[in-house]
């Protein structure tokens, strides 16, 4: 169901309303960043704001929207006719909301917005909270085998009625956290952002009229839907295209898991079928994927060169069907753990890129690496127990027109400043730099990961980490090479250096130990021999590529700080040109464990 559109706005008015909504959403973000207390929200910017129409369709959001349907689960419990101005609703229950939120630390708040007593929109904000209980400080552990170990679950509840807060509900929730004051501050910031967003929406309606604003909502959705449908029609031929990508492990068992996607297009309709994906994992890499997520992934990629197109629910309208199978990695059954769902979410992205590469003759981005988190849970003789949870950046895949992004945690988030990390977490950051040669070679180079040296200052500590793409590096496309894998080493320059598990928890460390975390790079795109030699030289001088890789991977011979053109031409003339689509350790067209993948999946939809 969509909103009625009785009064179409002029193009000028539509742009004014777009600007007002985007400004209001940015103002909500600024409020959260200033007022929140936890590092995840205040420094890393792990939060999200949006406006939705009265049917719950996303109208305005951040540029990276991977949330599910945020309103339907609330409306099931609290019908629209029971809502009042000043009400505020709250949840983090992944299973209870069908994947509206993807893991428990992401706490969602939604406020209905009224005009003259009639509901016309919702203002929404969520943030990743520092600790919500569970088996370990920080609530996320690679060793979790049940969602009950990952913190308290809040079903959709009304936390505010006509502006009056239900303090009892908040008190119960904060009592379950190891950091209640920090949690309370974050909740206040997010709730205030919703109130601010509702106020700005009301101002917009008072300025333009509710009918015009609702019509603008519909126009924005229709514009985005039309843009994605046009891109699909122009760039994806009718047919079936399949790809499978693998996750290193689930941290509980040593086996790898795969995400399997079959993309089907015919008669102007598009279907994305994940039903042949692996069974749900024992460990916490499960991802209860709302249907909107792969639709937004497709829309974000296909419309990324159209900056005037809004990232909104129009993407959902443009894709007819998402198919999953209960009990699989992307449709797990309760109470499978979910804390590391990003490992599977990123593999959904790379599987999508793989199918698009097959559909378009290689005109798709190479695979990104999965962003990294580590946990350092300290203990000192004076009884203090500092908690360090730090997200580390990786390399993203090369695009068809540009290098991959270097050293990025997630496109809409930030890295901790070193000064902040040292002051807040009781650690010393002794090195932070680019993981040289980690970006897959190509006409467009994959993004590079990073190297970060962390010195333990607590008397003792337990270390946990989630670092993927070590066994299964990010693949290259259309002749590009795969990115380099990651690694974790304790005391790398000492007498007894030791590699430790890249998916583990509870690893004992002592005061003075140094942990070197080396994160993976993204895949490259296109034949490395086609990269301009001067670009390769610039990468060498900037520390992204070594002289050895310049010669071995790109065929570029250097003489000091310049290109030896004659030697380069001779070396490149002797290099074999890749003829297969993908690269991961070797060039290939069909997946090793899926020889039928270049056409249709023989197992899609079967148990």
Q: What are the language-model segments listed below?
A:
Residues 2-85, 90, 94-115, 119-606:
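Glycine/proline-enriched, intrinsically flexible loops and inter-domain linkers
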């Amino acid at each position: 169901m969509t909103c009625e559109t009785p009064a179409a706005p002029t193009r000028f008015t539509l742009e004014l309303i777009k600007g007002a909504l985007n400004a209001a959403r940015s103002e909500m973000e600024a409020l959260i960043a200033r007022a929140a207390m936890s590092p995840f929200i205040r420094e890393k910017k792990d939060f999200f704001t949006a406006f939705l129409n009265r049917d719950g369709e996303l109208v305005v959001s951040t540029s990276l929207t991977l949330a599910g349907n945020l309103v339907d689960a609330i409306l099931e419990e609290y019908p629209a006719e029971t809502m009042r101005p000043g009400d505020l609703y709250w949840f983090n229950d992944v299973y209870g909301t069908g994947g509206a939120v993807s893991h428990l630390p992401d706490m969602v708040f939604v406020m209905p917005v009224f005009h003259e007593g009639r509901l016309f929109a919702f203002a929404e904000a969520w943030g990743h909270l520092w600790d919500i209980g569970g088996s370990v400080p920080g609530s996320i552990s690679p060793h979790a085998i049940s969602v009950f170990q990952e913190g308290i679950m809040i079903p959709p509840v009304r936390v505010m009625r006509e502006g009056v807060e239900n303090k009892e509900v908040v008190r119960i929730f904060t009592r379950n956290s190891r950091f209640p004051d920090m949690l309370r501050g974050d909740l206040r910031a997010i709730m205030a952002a919703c109130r601010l967003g509702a106020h700005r929406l009301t101002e917009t309606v008072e300025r333009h009229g509710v009918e015009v604003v609702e019509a603008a909502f519909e126009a924005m959705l229709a514009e985005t839907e039309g843009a994605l449908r046009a891109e699909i029609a122009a760039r994806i031929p009718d047919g079936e295209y399949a790809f499978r990508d693998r996750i290193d492990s689930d941290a509980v068992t040593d086996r790898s898991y795969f995400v399997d996607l079959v993309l089907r297009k015919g008669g102007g309709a598009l279907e994305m079928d994940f039903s042949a994906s692996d069974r749900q994992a024992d460990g916490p890499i499960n991802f209860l994927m709302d249907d909107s997520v792969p639709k937004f992934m497709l829309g974000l990629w296909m419309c990324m060169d159209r900056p005037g197109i809004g990232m909104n629910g129009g993407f959902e309208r443009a894709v007819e069907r998402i198919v999953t199978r209960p009990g699989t990695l992307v449709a797990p059954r309760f109470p499978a753990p979910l804390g590391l769902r990003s490992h599977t979410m990123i593999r959904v992205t790379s599987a999508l890129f793989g199918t698009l590469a097959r559909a378009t003759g290689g005109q798709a981005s190479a695979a990104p690496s999965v962003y990294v988190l580590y946990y350092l849970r300290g203990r000192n003789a004076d009884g203090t127990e500092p908690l360090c949870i730090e997200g580390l950046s990786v390399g993203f895949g090369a695009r068809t027109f540009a290098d991959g992004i270097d050293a990025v945690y997630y496109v809409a988030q930030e890295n901790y400043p070193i000064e902040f990390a040292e002051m807040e977490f009781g650690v010393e950051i002794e090195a932070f730099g680019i993981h040289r040669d980690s970006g897959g070679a190509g006409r467009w180079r994959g993004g590079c990961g990073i190297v970060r040296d962390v010195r333990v200052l607590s008397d003792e500590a337990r270390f946990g980490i989630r670092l993927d793409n070590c066994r299964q590096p990010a693949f290259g496309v259309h002749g590009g090479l795969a990115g380099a894998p990651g690694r974790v080493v304790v005391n790398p320059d000492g007498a007894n250096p030791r590699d430790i598990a890249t998916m583990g928890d509870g690893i004992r460390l002592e005061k003075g130990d140094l942990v070197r975390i080396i994160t993976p790079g993204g895949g490259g795109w296109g034949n490395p021999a086609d990269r301009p030699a001067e670009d390769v030289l610039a990468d060498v001088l900037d520390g992204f590529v070594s002289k050895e890789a310049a010669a071995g991977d790109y065929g570029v011979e250097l003489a000091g700080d310049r290109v030896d053109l004659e030697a380069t031409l001779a070396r490149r003339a002797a290099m074999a040109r890749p003829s297969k689509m993908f690269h991961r350790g070797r060039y290939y067209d069909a997946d090793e464990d899926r020889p039928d993948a270049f056409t249709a999946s023989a197992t899609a939809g079967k148990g």
